[in-house]
Amino acid sequence: AMQALFLMALEPIAETLADGNSYGFRKYRSCADATDQIYKCLHKKTSAQWVLEGDIKGCFDHISHEWLLDNVIIDKEMLRKWLKAGVIEKNVFHMTDEGTPQGGIISPTLANITLDGMEALVAKHSTRRDNGKTYSNKVNLVRYADDFIVTGDTKEVLEEIKSELIVFLKDRGLELSEEKTLITHIKDGFDFLGFNIRKYGNGMLLIKPSKKNQKKFAESTHEVIYKMRSAKQTDVIGKLNPKISGWANYYRYVSSKEVFSKLDHIIFLQLRRWSIRRHHDKSLKWIEKKYWQHDGKRGWIFGTKGKDKKGKEKIYRLIQLTHTPIL
């Protein structure tokens, strides 16, 4: 409760000082806003060609307590108590000498305050002089919590920015992961917040669900279906639907049509295996009739009749990713 009160006092100050293109843990901002900003920075023919993909090692765990105490406008004694409160891991209490309070509602704001200022650092490199002329370096920072990218016209300008970011972060007790912090050409593409962002041969920039997240999602539906191999069909649908709609809503703002179609097919195959396992001795036609319903344009849908909590008859149907409108 005390943290919530302090957060109410701290948030307006943090908002005033916040980087313009920081999108994580801030009111009225989302991942969709972050990807939209990246699109604006990279989609034109004349846009930056290079991207610095930043990866901060265990950001929440390593922020310097000294830096926070010196820089956060909040009661120092109270902040010191929270920072030293420690964490309980596997029922063992550990004292903490660095990082923000685990699970504390104030932690995301403290992390944002720590990383604000990166945008000003990047902006210092906005232009370069060459043969008496001034050129734009096309530098932009987009940050979501501790994930960030910096765009740039050349690899060299991003190398310079990276060197300065290393110093900026060191002051705050943080460091970049050497193996995960990469400078990538936009034609090779990069992953950010579960999206893959890449400019193709025709000059078109496409944002799609990342391969890694597609795989993760297919594995998670497989796990649900496998664990529920002897459950009722209505329960399987009840478990899968929130998972499917959550994933579809996250990716509905980008080029997801093909991926949605592919994953719908994977889920269909997973459920077909689930139904065949239950009825080894029955024909595919019998199984299809029992577990699938034909719905005009939508084709075959995994569904059945059941009863709701009040005992009323209800039709239970599996949501399909492709039925989510792409915005």
Residue ranges and their predicted role:
Residues K84, R172-K239, K243-S245:
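A conserved non-catalytic segment of reverse transcriptases
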Residues Q270, S275-L327:
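Extended C-terminal regions of large enzymes
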Residues A1, K155-E156, E258:
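A generic structural signal for alpha-helix starts
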Residues M8-G24:
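Charged boundary/loop elements
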Residues V224-K285:
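Right-hand nucleic-acid polymerase module
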Residues A4, M8, P12, E66, ...:
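Short, residue-level hotspots on alpha-helical faces of the histone-fold
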Residues G20-N21, R26, D33-G189:
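Conserved polymerase palm-domain catalytic core
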Residues A1-L7, C31, T35, Y39:
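Duplex nucleic acid-engaging cores and interfaces of nucleic-acid transaction enzymes
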